[in-house]
Amino acid sequence: MVLLRDNIEVQPLSNNRRIRKNFGHINLVADIPNLIEIQKNSYEKNFLQLNIKDSERKNKGLQSILNSIFPISDSSNIANLEFVKYEFDTPKYDVEECSQRSLSYAAPLKVTLRLSIWDIDEDTGTREIKGIKEQEVYMGDIPLMTKNGTFIINGTERVVVSQMHRSPGVFFYHDEGKIHSSGKLLYSARVIPYRGSWLDLEFDAKDIIYFRIDRKRKLYATTLLRAIGMSTEEIIKFYYNSVTYKLVQNKGWAVKFMPGHITAHRLTSDLVDADTGNVLLKAGQKITPRLAQKYFREGLNNVLVARETLIGKYLSEDLRDPVSDEILAKIGEMITADMLNVINDLKIKNVNVLVVNPQSGPYIRNTLFADKNQDRETALCDIFRVLRPGEPANIEAAEGLFYNLFFDAERYDLSEVGRIKMNSRLELNISEEVTVLTIDDIKNIVRVLVELKDGKGIIDDIDHLGNRRVRSVGELIENQFRIGLVRMEKSVIERMSAGDVDTLMPHDLVNSKILVSVVKEFFSTSQLSQFMDQTNPLSEITHKRRLSALGPGGLSRDRAGFEVRDVHPTHYGRICPIETPEGQNIGLINSMATYARINKHGFIESPYRRVKDGRVTDEVVYLSAIEEGKYKIGQANSKVDKDGVLQGEFINCRVEGGNFVMVEPHEVDFIDVTPMQVVSVAASLIPFLENDDANRALMGSNMQRQAVPLIKTDAPFVGTGVEGVVAKDSGASVLALHDGIVEQVDSNRIVIRTLAQKADGSPSVDIYNLLKFQKSNHNTCINQKPLVKVGHYVKKNDIIADGPSTDNGEIALGRNVLVAFLPWNGYNFEDSILISERIVKEDIFTSIHIEEFEVIARDTRLGPEEITRDIPNVSEEALSHLDEVGIIYVGAEVKAGDILVGKVTPKSESPITPEEKLLRAIFGEKAFDVKDSSLHVPSGVSGTVVEVRIFSRRGVEKDQRAIAIEKQQIEKLAKDRDDELEIVEHFVFSWLEKLLVGQVIINGPKQVKAGQTITTEVLKGLSKGQFWQLTVEDANIMNEIEQIKTHYDEKKEALNKRFATKVEKLQSGDDLPQGALKVVKVFIATKHKLQPGDKMAGRHGNKGVISRIVPEEDMPFLEDGTVVDIVLNPLGLPSRMNIGQILETHLGWASINLAKKISTLVQEYQNKKIAIEQIKKFLIKLYGENINSVLERSEEEIISFCKKVSKGVHFATPVFDGAKVQDVKDMLKLADQDPSGQVKLIDGRTGEYFDRLVTVGQKYLLKLHHLVDNKIHSRSIGPYSLVTQQPLGGKSHFGGQRFGEMECWALQAYGAAYTLQEMLTVKSDDVNGRIKTYDSIVRGENNFESGIPESFNVMIKEFRSLCLNVKLEVTSS
């Protein structure tokens, strides 16, 4: 047993962990990877390479960009600016300070640059170094990521969402027969680089191949082939095989027999063996590929064909006169009847022709002959004219342009991924470092395109996850950085060329503003940098794991079709098929699956267990969609014996293309890790997900993200076992940084003495300051509560404090309530919800919302604005909540219209006489006219002031309130310092005591004598400071004491220095925006109780609005008198098909009844009626092996565990591997309940039983962020639109109700002419009529007159703008 100071016993915190009865059957081999590592790895590891030494940094991220941009040289090569290394300074403010001061959390980037200046000898041209200057240059502040994977930009927390985009590489498609009326498939290829010009190749309806660059005008593909330097002969030789026709005297031509090119058909002429002259098949007989192969095997090498057969074939080389060697026909020309006669006349023996047949079409040859360009120069000029129309084309410019397009690494980058994809698709073996196009690439793209047209190979599936990759934060910011540095490079070159380089230093050349503005713009305005969804911890995690197909370089909503949005077989285990928004973004915004991760190339990987010879091993392998296609993968629930050997004759496996096959166990390569790897985090929190309809599951996972954190949190009785992981990874709860023992705890902070000692042997101290009532991005309340007590022993990563929506380290988005499914007087019509008054009374669904209000005192033209209590024309009563400075007290209750901060603004006044001016100058009197510009509580807001923050500009004197707040903060910092010092001192002096006791004194303070032996009593008589004055005989001990003293002094100094720095920061004043003298922020917390109109939901997509709050005595109740909390409509189930909620209700019913049973057992044990063994037996029956760790503890601890589950037993039913119907029935039986889960219910109003049994049970319900208080509003007096003079609309404008077109029709249908008239005139935009009506109401009359509505005048004006003059003319009758 370990004892703390003051003899408090140390207890392990793990004893407090919640134990759930788990229904899962599959043992988890792999842990869920950290849920936010996708963000952190991408930015900190891959982009910034933060805590890595300069020499060990890899060439990626920031390092690779700086390497690629530098060195920068001027045009004459006299000056050269090189990059040496970069590093980050510590940020000026920490995360919390940035949030409070509306600043960005960023660190200064310092880059070391070397400027070399050369001397060039004008005569010889030789270069000599003239001078080298190296300097560290500040390149702006780069935003840092917080520990939770977010960024603080201008004080708000933002998330950069990962983007799914098409992977770089080459892709082959066809148009699905949509372009041409005949439905013919037109094939095309597209080369997509990471950056640079796109290259498209396509067939047209006439089977000619064209290419386009960047979707400009199309040109013949052979122009491109000629531009890369291929001649006609090379083109034909590369794409076609050649065959020789040999003349056989008087018989025809002998040609090689090629059985591979034969398709089944009837012969038009005899099949004759050229060598023997035998006729093998007669004309009219059928030949098949199999028969052709048979003849070939039997020795048929050459066949005889008629002379005319050559007509229509294409020459595979120039046809020359055998005598004069004159060219008769060019390569590729078609043999005509005339040409055949010439061949006969000249007795040419051998003719070489191209092999063109249905398996190898004449497309390239036809394109060659359609193309007018015959050489490289004309081809290049042609391309130049298309890309630069209007510019004169010369060969140098054309060559330069073409090279820059695809072959210049500065302008074209396929990226490593693109090169890998290109190599695998074109079957090439080019080094991965070559990230530009090569001549081989272009030749082979055309080859594969032609092969596709010939029916070989298949087109690419664009939605396959092997063809889509993820760009995470690091990569997105890397691209912005590159843009910024390229712009900066231009300005560096300009500055080098402009001035005298000899006198310049590196910092004179670099303008960091260009870079900073690009990065700033990305974080503040990019579509992918989003305001973090901070409603609850789950919504934060989901936001960080989101994958968006939208954004720059991605798709747009309007153009995205069904295919892109649809679920694809490769999504399995990578992207969740359930969680996606409803509406126009459906399928374009997805969520990563629970176990998925992103590899270095940006492809999503999913984990699998390796299977060797039919035995499942514990080796976990991550596979991307491309790799997965090569294997046979079994499902996680395949039957396995205790040794891991797959059972059964055949196993159902997934193979490429999303197909399923049955294979023998030894053929299986991998099996899924767990069935849960298919879905996302939010979906994995839904118990019985497998029993819900997919549409409802989608709503369920989306609505969990809208659940508001409640005052009292309560983890679900029926969970899935993932709750703890979500709470831990979300960053909402506080994790212990090291192993240690809790020294102090209160509601604001936890102090832990760590057990991991430092190098000097002294303990370090961890102080955790908890967040209290902070406002989240969505105005919900962030509040942390400690879970530990003094003396608890905590391990690293234990949860020591709960955050919002967490309960004992598990995520708790709602509450467990007793639900009955029955109709109740029509109050639960159309998904309405009926709730008991108890829920409101006991604050079961009460939440706290915090709003922030800000007022700025500025320096105006007429003088400074002032924050003051002295406000003109305001009663003392209205100022009762304000302090002497004019700022509201913390704790004040406020309602709409109350003053929060008093402020006056000078207003211009009448000119003053010189005498008055003189008096004012003498007496310094400020008799300025001022107007009230105070901050009031807006309409619809009421609550308690929980915090006030005051920021004053540097140099502006602070007011009393600001000084008081500052003092409070300094006291808090001093307490942290003193506590840490106290723990260190306690350790140091107890160590000294151990060393000194038993030693002989040589010298020391007055109280001790030389030669005396030190005892504990002697030391007690000395003060702590006097310990250091003692000198003892043992020299070794003296050395050790000296070392301890040095360490102690260093530690003390470090703590004081840190304290002083923080205090200085507090006292120094703030950086405020231009013109602002002082900023005051007031935070108001409002308690929202549940009320009619609030939206609630379960986890299965079952949502509804509260219709009525019923007194407890009128609600239905159970036979034991328990009143039902909520009544739901049973008709909301059958059509919605989310049966999971019924199973959850049944299991919840078992949960509370089992808890009652355990409580009864405990009571009997305490009354000495039963032994502890009976309780143990029951717990084993209920929990199985999970409970062993509890049963090993003492009897008191077992009883304390039983008391913890007295409200309800917690279950875990993992997704797709959870409780079956039989398990639920077994639990109900164990709880001594009817296995149907239904009970007799009594009507609270009549006291009679309902006719039928009713399903009753505990269900987990959430209160959603759609609160009626934020939506309902009414208008009495308010603003009008300037043009139409009609009241504005909407709550934010304090607007009225729109009486629209259809509402007018309704009144017309009733014939309510007068009602209609007043609606369209005095109640809307008849200005004079409005005033007259008001007058008549004031006078007590009830008549009014309608005039012409303003909108009629607007219409007349619009007519006039069309030059139509409309006048109202009254003619006499």
Swiss-Prot record:
<dbReference type="InterPro" id="IPR007120">
    <property type="entry name" value="DNA-dir_RNAP_su2_dom"/>
</dbReference>
<dbReference type="Pfam" id="PF04565">
    <property type="entry name" value="RNA_pol_Rpb2_3"/>
</dbReference>
<dbReference type="InterPro" id="IPR007642">
    <property type="entry name" value="RNA_pol_Rpb2_2"/>
</dbReference>
<dbReference type="GO" id="GO:0003677">
    <property type="term" value="F:DNA binding"/>
</dbReference>
<dbReference type="InterPro" id="IPR007641">
    <property type="entry name" value="RNA_pol_Rpb2_7"/>
</dbReference>
<dbReference type="InterPro" id="IPR007644">
    <property type="entry name" value="RNA_pol_bsu_protrusion"/>
</dbReference>
<dbReference type="InterPro" id="IPR019462">
    <property type="entry name" value="DNA-dir_RNA_pol_bsu_external_1"/>
</dbReference>
<keyword id="KW-0548">Nucleotidyltransferase</keyword>
<dbReference type="GO" id="GO:0000428">
    <property type="term" value="C:DNA-directed RNA polymerase complex"/>
</dbReference>
<dbReference type="Pfam" id="PF04560">
    <property type="entry name" value="RNA_pol_Rpb2_7"/>
</dbReference>
<dbReference type="Pfam" id="PF04563">
    <property type="entry name" value="RNA_pol_Rpb2_1"/>
</dbReference>
<dbReference type="InterPro" id="IPR015712">
    <property type="entry name" value="DNA-dir_RNA_pol_su2"/>
</dbReference>
<dbReference type="InterPro" id="IPR042107">
    <property type="entry name" value="DNA-dir_RNA_pol_bsu_ext_1_sf"/>
</dbReference>
<dbReference type="GO" id="GO:0006351">
    <property type="term" value="P:DNA-templated transcription"/>
</dbReference>
<dbReference type="GO" id="GO:0003899">
    <property type="term" value="F:DNA-directed RNA polymerase activity"/>
</dbReference>
<dbReference type="InterPro" id="IPR010243">
    <property type="entry name" value="RNA_pol_bsu_bac"/>
</dbReference>
<dbReference type="Pfam" id="PF10385">
    <property type="entry name" value="RNA_pol_Rpb2_45"/>
</dbReference>
<protein>
    <recommendedName>
        <fullName>DNA-directed RNA polymerase subunit beta</fullName>
        <ecNumber>2.7.7.6</ecNumber>
    </recommendedName>
</protein>
<keyword id="KW-0808">Transferase</keyword>
<dbReference type="Pfam" id="PF04561">
    <property type="entry name" value="RNA_pol_Rpb2_2"/>
</dbReference>
<dbReference type="GO" id="GO:0032549">
    <property type="term" value="F:ribonucleoside binding"/>
</dbReference>
<keyword id="KW-0240">DNA-directed RNA polymerase</keyword>
<keyword id="KW-0804">Transcription</keyword>
<dbReference type="InterPro" id="IPR037033">
    <property type="entry name" value="DNA-dir_RNAP_su2_hyb_sf"/>
</dbReference>
<dbReference type="InterPro" id="IPR007121">
    <property type="entry name" value="RNA_pol_bsu_CS"/>
</dbReference>
<comment type="function">
    <text>DNA-dependent RNA polymerase catalyzes the transcription of DNA into RNA using the four ribonucleoside triphosphates as substrates.</text>
</comment>
<comment type="subunit">
    <text>The RNAP catalytic core consists of 2 alpha, 1 beta, 1 beta' and 1 omega subunit. When a sigma factor is associated with the core the holoenzyme is formed, which can initiate transcription.</text>
</comment>
<dbReference type="InterPro" id="IPR014724">
    <property type="entry name" value="RNA_pol_RPB2_OB-fold"/>
</dbReference>
<dbReference type="Pfam" id="PF00562">
    <property type="entry name" value="RNA_pol_Rpb2_6"/>
</dbReference>
<dbReference type="InterPro" id="IPR007645">
    <property type="entry name" value="RNA_pol_Rpb2_3"/>
</dbReference>
<comment type="similarity">
    <text>Belongs to the RNA polymerase beta chain family.</text>
</comment>
